[in-house]
Amino acid sequence: MARAQALVLALTFQLCAPETETPAAGCTFEEASDPAVPCEYSQAQYDDFQWEQVRIHPGTRAPADLPHGSYLMVNTSQHAPGQRAHVIFQSLSENDTHCVQFSYFLYSRDGHSPGTLGVYVRVNGGPLGSAVWNMTGSHGRQWHQAELAVSTFWPNEYQVLFEALISPDRRGYMGLDDILLLSYPCAKAPHFSRLGDVEVNAGQNASFQCMAAGRAAEAERFLLQRQSGALVPAAGVRHISHRRFLATFPLAAVSRAEQDLYRCVSQAPRGAGVSNFAELIVKEPPTPIAPPQLLRAGPTYLIIQLNTNSIIGDGPIVRKEIEYRMARGPWAEVHAVSLQTYKLWHLDPDTEYEISVLLTRPGDGGTGRPGPPLISRTKCAEPMRAPKGLAFAEIQARQLTLQWEPLGYNVTRCHTYTVSLCYHYTLGSSHNQTIRECVKTEQGVSRYTIKNLLPYRNVHVRLVLTNPEGRKEGKEVTFQTDEDVPSGIAAESLTFTPLEDMIFLKWEEPQEPNGLITQYEISYQSIESSDPAVNVPGPRRTISKLRNETYHVFSNLHPGTTYLFSVRARTGKGFGQAALTEITTNISAPSFDYADMPSPLGESENTITVLLRPAQGRGAPISVYQVIVEEERARRLRREPGGQDCFPVPLTFEAALARGLVHYFGAELAASSLPEAMPFTVGDNQTYRGFWNPPLEPRKAYLIYFQAASHLKGETRLNCIRIARKAACKESKRPLEVSQRSEEMGLILGICAGGLAVLILLLGAIIVIIRKGRDHYAYSYYPKPVNMTKATVNYRQEKTHMMSAVDRSFTDQSTLQEDERLGLSFMDTHGYSTRGDQRSGGVTEASSLLGGSPRRPCGRKGSPYHTGQLHPAVRVADLLQHINQMKTAEGYGFKQEYESFFEGWDATKKKDKVKGSRQEPMPAYDRHRVKLHPMLGDPNADYINANYIDGYHRSNHFIATQGPKPEMVYDFWRMVWQEHCSSIVMITKLVEVGRVKCSRYWPEDSDTYGDIKIMLVKTETLAEYVVRTFALERRGYSARHEVRQFHFTAWPEHGVPYHATGLLAFIRRVKASTPPDAGPIVIHCSAGTGRTGCYIVLDVMLDMAECEGVVDIYNCVKTLCSRRVNMIQTEEQYIFIHDAILEACLCGETTIPVSEFKATYKEMIRIDPQSNSSQLREEFQTLNSVTPPLDVEECSIALLPRNRDKNRSMDVLPPDRCLPFLISTDGDSNNYINAALTDSYTRSAAFIVTLHPLQSTTPDFWRLVYDYGCTSIVMLNQLNQSNSAWPCLQYWPEPGRQQYGLMEVEFMSGTADEDLVARVFRVQNISRLQEGHLLVRHFQFLRWSAYRDTPDSKKAFLHLLAEVDKWQAESGDGRTIVHCLNGGGRSGTFCACATVLEMIRCHNLVDVFFAAKTLRNYKPNMVETMDQYHFCYDVALEYLEGLESR
């Protein structure tokens, strides 16, 4: 028994041994507590009251309800309900499993609850949360023990707080004692395993799994406690084993607001288990902040960029999707996307879509809400077909009502479309003007009435369906309007020829026949007459004429009578308005009532008495009678009675005697004095109305004439008749009888002859009338002959000195108000005048800024090149200042302006059309793309990479395209044929920088491309461009087209031309050579962009400057880029356009036709008395002002130290860009020589201008001759010219041969005259004898004195030019070396004159300014002085006068 008791005691000791271990920390509240166990606690500062530490021992006065011992106590009766007090245990941070044990005392004598004792566990100083354990009620007058199994470990720390909460009963005591930290597991509370974080997407269910070890009491509750204090009960507890169980806590559809820290808590009366805090991580599914971006829209596709860089929500993003739907549609589709851009296919044209982006992160429910939608509309697609079923509904004379099939969306493929009714008809006038109009009908309407038409016209109508992406034209249908009454015959078309009793009347068809003219009706009647015998108004007579008879001869009319004529035309609808005119017949000569010559009533030696009978007036009364006496002489032809040779000039006897005439007026009688026949004695020595009737001389024979005159309205008609003959008295009787018989026979013959003459005259008059009628029928209008002196119309404009003009423009422009500047045309604003304009007394400002051909009318129809507000047009007068500001501006200059073209720029490419594009093609915008006529079997045959470009006030004036590749040559010629193009502009070489830029699309002679045959007709080669003329024929067509290709070859392989002179001349040549009625001008370079755009901008701006006085380069380029992508490719090109326009405005058009040169030149050299200057001088000053000096950087090679000795003067150096580098190597000598390559008119680099060789450079000079194949040397200075500082030594052998370095020069022959010494040399390279020799002719000009700016003789200089030209033609057109002392003024004068003569021979033009400017582009010292410039004009004049004299 004893052993059994001992064994029980031993087991009891072992079981209880852990409980007697020393705690790691704690508070027993005893005075003699173990110092090894520190007691650290505190009470909250802001509690409602404080716990009271009491020590009650036996014998201590204390309430009987309290147990003995030292502990913390709360007397609840002393505090108000709801008041709280806390005891805060020290912070704990344990590494291993431990247990917090405490004792508590809750007692109320009446059994009511004194309050609630709660225990809180605060982790890392966080919020207090909810109590993990609490106890209420009265539990007897004894201590109870509870445990806390806290699973929070280092590095985290936690605090245990004990809270006393006063109950409403307020009776009893609450005590707390022995708060101990034990280093072993709790026996009464389970320990939780580590609780892990839970991550879930918002809106999804979450679940915490709490695993606990220990024994769970039946009454034990498991809770999920949120750090903020909320509690979630366990959905279920599952026992894994007898000491392990699992509590599950589901959270349904969590949101971001529920993201917090959570821990598991088990609660039982004997203690609580508390896990670590785990985080519930709620991820918000991602949603884009911004809608997707539209990159490009097509008719059936949208290309978008997802734009997902900024999102709302959490990543990572594992999937991207596009959700799209019609804006008004019920359906939606979702497509997965793997790239940042996505193309939505198979969309409907012109339809609005909502497009959103869906983003998905990992986990269920990871797909976020759709992002903000992009609402975008697809482009319209090209219409499926043109409208069909065009037919008339009603036809009237002046209007047509047409109808067609209604259109649906499946045809229009766009909600925004227009149906245009395009029609045209001819006016039918002599000009055959065609009226063309397109009328837009209202959308949805399929009926339209065309009004204000002309009757009986063929109206050609076609329907055009247009939407923003294209157009479809229907077949042309012809309708004819109904007839109407014709318009009135134009009164001015009535032409007539009045005679005495006839009128020839001619008229023209009405300007508006309004149908088929069936007849003409002419009515006439007399309305006034000066002949009293004529009854007025007379009866009205009417005649009708056939439709092809537009004239009539009215006969049997009364002389001197006015007739009213009315002419009107008739169609099937009736008569039109009549044209009225009054025509007066001519008065006729009076008529006499003499059947034959009467016998005299009496006769004496000095008198003869005749019978005067009154005459009858015809159309006018008789005004006066006159008796004329004529001495009969044998030599005089006899006057026949009734002849027209009357006596219109009254002549007295004295006047006739003084003038030696044989006739005189013997009497003048008033008409009223001869009412009836009466005798009159000739020679009665009386005076009748101022005319003396002297006695007749007996020994003379006389002829007596009686003349009647009628005067009316300034018109006089005479008739005279011989009424008697008086013979000389000296004749015997017999001869007298014979004479009298002869006289009688003569009288009879005279009467017959007179009658015959009258008959012939009448027949002649009729023939003349008929011929006039025919002529009038053939030609509708005869201008009256006017003596005109043709004024000299000059082709060029006056120019003043550029700098002074520009300076004036800067000061004058401020006085011109804005509305004035906009309202005035360029010519008005800038005082445009041409050379030879006599109305202009001086030169104007504008004349220095812009020259040109005589001002052409500038249309004001809508131009596509509109001036912008942010970039307004620049006045020509302000252009120089504007360019200088843009080049020197620091904030906003050409760079920024050029870059602004590409802001928001979106290049479009035509898909599936690779055939006509280059490797990196510039795409053609569909809206302005040239569409070829379709071909059978090839659906893509309508495509060519070409765009229509508007000109200045001329739509689709250009076609910009790329240089044809081999496979698109046929399409290129198809386009030229289809568009009726007459000009092709090519601005590229076939190969540049070793790359093929364009295929040779034209034949050497003749070739066929598809069904088009191209024949090269002519090639004209000039220095900077080539003009080729082709003839085009196409199978199935009878027409033959002529096309010119203008090939500009001077554009450098890199950058832009150094000067714009040649390009401007090229543009003018193209403009002048292109017929006004031709189709578009085709322009191409390689890609059809940069150079092509430069050309078009220059062409348009030159016209704008001429017509409006302003240039708007920025908006012009902007408009071009809207037609074709990237039309100006570089900033350098953009600046070049400005410089070129400035040069054009400053220099102007200076070409003079040969036919006008003499008069123009005379005007140019005339000194203006106001300015004391001439136009020629002003032109030379302009030349100086536009010749920039060379910069040091431009002459870097000439300035190298090793080359300084090769320059005669450091002031005259050649620029690097035109140096002829020597090819032949000669020891240590380098390849530099002071020389420059320059162009002639027809050949590039035709001249090499250099200085007279120095002694050290003579070998280099002959190397230059040989290396560049120079067959002519022109020497314009004299040997030993100037002083010893400028030696001009002989550099050739004469005679014999001499070696200069590698070159051997041999004198072959020579000729000389007073003007010129010509030598022939043979030059060869002794190091390369196999190359053969070069024959060179040396021309030494002798007629240019040392100190003169110009040659002594123009004729001698022309002789030099002719000899050089002749030799060049014979020797195969080698280069010409021209030298003078310094390679400047004299050499430039020679080259300029040679260039001008080439112009005359090639194109009958003279342009000295162009020749000099071109030369100065290479060397600024060419044509140095005003005298030399003047001399060039003199040489041209001398040459032309020589041509005229041949």
Swiss-Prot record:
Residues 288-383, 386-484, 485-591, 592-674 form the Fibronectin type-III domain. InterPro entries: ConA-like_dom_sf (IPR013320), FN3_dom (IPR003961), FN3_sf (IPR036116), Ig-like_dom_sf (IPR036179), Ig-like_fold (IPR013783), MAM_dom (IPR000998), Prot-tyrosine_phosphatase-like (IPR029021), PTP_cat (IPR000242). GO terms for molecular function: beta-catenin binding; protein tyrosine phosphatase activity; transmembrane receptor protein tyrosine phosphatase activity. Residues 833-861 are annotated as: Disordered. The keyword Membrane applies. GO terms for biological process: animal organ regeneration; cell adhesion; cell surface receptor protein tyrosine phosphatase signaling pathway; homotypic cell-cell adhesion; negative regulation of canonical Wnt signaling pathway; negative regulation of cell migration; negative regulation of cell population proliferation; neuron projection development. Its EC number is 3.1.3.48. It catalyses: O-phospho-L-tyrosyl-[protein] + H2O = L-tyrosyl-[protein] + phosphate. This is Receptor-type tyrosine-protein phosphatase U. It comes from Homo sapiens (Human).
